[in-house]
């Protein structure tokens, strides 16, 4: 027996008419037979299932195409004009920079302004001054021939290179400078960077990556610290210029490699020729022997020793009689003794060419101005010819200051007797760090008032790995006379006595 429901019959009839209508409309569209055939084969002519899915399709289209309804924000609070003004008046913005410390205020207050870079010049107010704070160790910044060559190049090539060396920044002047540096030191190749500071901070990460090992002097300069930080390498520090501690660390690493059968990695020892923070000299002979024994490569930063050490200024390799090829990577500065600009890295051809595509500072920085490149290779030419006499003069004047300093009861120095950078530190270690800074700054000001410019070694203490005792930094140059050096040594002693008496500081040593 079959039952009939008129309502459902009407709905079903209406549905069939609708489907027939849309079916005819669908026939007009290209590819509709394929769709209809797919529907029939998929749902086996089940109209109810097709109807339900059609409703879902209509609902989805409605949901996507409908206009979004904005709901009222329950957290919105409407303020009156008076309340807004009160909130604005009460608001205290945070300062963009932290308030200056007492030390920073003292530093900003006591910055001298000079008329020129010469060793004998004037302050901006016209008072004569002898500059013992300049890194112009060989007095080449005042060399007339170098100045004339630099000016002529400036007129020919313009001020800047206006592009990185790898694109269009390299000029024939740069190529000659690289060739002259390599020839002067006695290595295969050299590469020139636009800034001295960024040279070693770029060279280290170019060769050392995550998983490699760096054994570094704990008192290394800030540029080295930045380089090893960028490299993300495993780092071990040895005590400053302590070869026994260095050998202990190398042996520990070797034992660890053997014990755990670790894979072979790149391993470097990093140190300075003359320490920027202490002025003392590393034992290159011993460190080369250790790096050969334990199969390490050596990165030697000669920023302060190139142009100041050795018979003709070739650096520590010449000073100790070590073949320059025994040092894999030699870093040097062109801004000190050579009176130019930038820095360089010298060594094997393979090592140098690797940096042209991997040295970040070489790739992304504009090339060294051509005029500074010319000044540097003209200075190298002078060193090649007259370096022997110039270096003898520099060493004798450094030794003279050391001799006069030995009579000073307030200061001691860790600087090597042949180093032109001399750090003077208080013998009394009980004086607090900040008080030492204030005392040294006052001594500097008193010396400037007497016509001698010296400087306190300044560092960003919060960024330094090791806190170094404050010091006066004296820079000796061949342009200084023996009388000036003797007078400065006596003046520092006199002014220190005045400052100690003024602040009632009792020298405990």
Curated annotation (Swiss-Prot):
Gene3D superfamilies: Aspartate Aminotransferase, domain 1 (3.90.1150.10), Type I PLP-dependent aspartate aminotransferase-like (Major domain) (3.40.640.10). The chain crosses the membrane at residues 45-65, 327-347, 363-383. Pfam families: Aminotran_1_2. Pathway: Lipid metabolism; sphingolipid metabolism. It comes from the Eukaryota. One of its GO terms (molecular function) is pyridoxal phosphate binding. Its cofactor is pyridoxal 5'-phosphate. InterPro entries: Aminotransferase_I/II_large, AON_synthase_class-II, PyrdxlP-dep_Trfase, PyrdxlP-dep_Trfase_major, PyrdxlP-dep_Trfase_small. It catalyses: L-serine + hexadecanoyl-CoA + H(+) = 3-oxosphinganine + CO2 + CoA. One of its GO terms (biological process) is sphingosine biosynthetic process. Its EC number is 2.3.1.50. It is found in: Cytoplasm; Endoplasmic reticulum; Membrane. It is a multi-pass membrane protein. It is an enzyme of class 2 (transferase). Component of serine palmitoyltransferase (SPT), which catalyzes the committed step in the synthesis of sphingolipids, the condensation of serine with palmitoyl CoA to form the long chain base 3-ketosphinganine. Belongs to the class-II pyridoxal-phosphate-dependent aminotransferase family. Lcb1 and lcb2 encode essential subunits of the enzyme and form a heterodimer. This is Serine palmitoyltransferase 1. It comes from Schizosaccharomyces pombe (strain 972 / ATCC 24843) (Fission yeast). The gene is lcb1.
């Amino acid at each position: 027996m079959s039952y009939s429901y008129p309502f459902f019959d009407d709905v079903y009839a209406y549905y069939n008419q609708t489907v027939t209508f849309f079916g005819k409309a669908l026939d007009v569209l290209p590819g509709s037979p394929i769709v209809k055939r797919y529907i029939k084969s998929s749902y086996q002519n089940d109209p109810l299932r097709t109807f339900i899915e059609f409703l879902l399709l209509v609902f989805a289209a409605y949901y996507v195409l409908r206009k979004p309804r904005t709901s009222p924000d329950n957290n919105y609070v409407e303020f009156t004009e008076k309340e807004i003004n009160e909130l604005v008046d009460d608001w205290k913005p945070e300062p963009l920079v932290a308030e200056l410390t007492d030390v920073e205020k003292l530093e900003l207050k006591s910055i001298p302004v000079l008329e020129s870079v010469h060793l004998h010049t004037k302050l901006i107010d016209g008072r004569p001054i002898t500059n013992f704070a300049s890194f112009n160790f060989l007095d080449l910044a005042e060399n007339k021939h170098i100045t004339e060559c630099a000016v002529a190049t400036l007129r020919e090539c313009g001020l800047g290179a206006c592009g990185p060396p790898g694109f269009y920044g390299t000029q024939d002047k740069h190529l000659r400078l690289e060739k002259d540096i390599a020839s002067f030191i006695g290595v295969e190749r050299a590469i020139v960077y636009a800034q001295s500071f960024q040279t070693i901070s770029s060279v280290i990460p170019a060769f050392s990556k995550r998983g490699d090992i760096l054994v570094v002097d704990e008192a290394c300069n800030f540029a080295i610290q930045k380089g090893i930080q960028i490299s993300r390498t495993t780092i071990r520090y040895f005590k400053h210029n302590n070869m026994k501690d260095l050998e202990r660390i190398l042996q520990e690493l070797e034992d660890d490699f053997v014990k755990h059968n670790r894979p072979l990695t790149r391993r470097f020892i990093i140190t300075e020729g003359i320490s920027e923070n202490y002025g003392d000299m590393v034992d290159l002979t011993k460190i080369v022997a250790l790096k050969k024994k334990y199969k390490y490569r050596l990165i030697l930063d000669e920023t302060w020793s190139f142009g100041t050490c050795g018979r003709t200024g070739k650096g520590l390799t010449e000073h100790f009689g070590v073949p320059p090829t025994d040092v894999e990577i030699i870093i040097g500065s062109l801004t000190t003794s050579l009176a130019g600009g930038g820095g360089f890295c010298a060594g094997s051809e393979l090592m140098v060419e690797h940096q042209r595509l991997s040295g970040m500072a070489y790739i992304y920085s504009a090339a060294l101005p051509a005029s500074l490149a010319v000044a540097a290779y003209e200075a190298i030419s002078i060193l090649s010819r007259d370096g022997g006499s110039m270096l003898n003069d520099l060493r004798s004047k450094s030794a003279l200051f050391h001799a006069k300093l030995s009579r000073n009861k307030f200061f001691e120095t860790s600087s090597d007797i042949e180093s032109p950078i001399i750090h003077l530190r208080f013998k009394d270690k009980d004086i607090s760090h900040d008080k030492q800074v204030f005392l040294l700054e006052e001594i500097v000001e008193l010396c400037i008032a007497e016509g001698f410019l010296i400087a306190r070694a300044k560092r960003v203490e919060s960024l330094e790995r090791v806190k170094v005792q404050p010091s006066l930094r004296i820079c000796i140059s061949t342009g200084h006379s023996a009388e000036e050096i003797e007078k400065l040594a006596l003046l520092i002693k006199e002014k220190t006595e005045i400052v100690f008496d003024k602040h009632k500081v009792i020298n405990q040593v």
